Amino acid sequence: MFENLLTSIGINSLKVDTLVKSEYISPNDSLSGIITLYGGNATQLVNKIELSLVERYDNPDERSQIPVLENELETLILHKNININKEEQRSEEFKFNLPEVSFKRNPDYLILKTRVYIANSVDAYDEDKIFLK
């Protein structure tokens, strides 16, 4: 019971790690890898897993309190409503295509953001840099 309370506020809760097969990508290329979920001290319900490929760039508005903006290029949703048991480790392969995109700037790299939406708890996150060829 106490473990459920701790995991609901993010202590010893589910963790996520995303590993990409290649750190380099070209436009019209595909991006693939493995997402691994590590169960915490209690079973948790994952509402969904979302992968987003984004470009980050400096905000041109100098008066803004938000110094960095994101341009979301592509999103992939994996799984809906799965249970991850206590201390369970589960891996899932993913692959999605990067269509011809219009960048806001001329970035050297993109960010692959992984967000695991966890019911009644703090969500789990991971970020990886993907360099452009």
State what each model feature region is:
Residues 1-75, 82-133:
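N-terminal onset of structured domains
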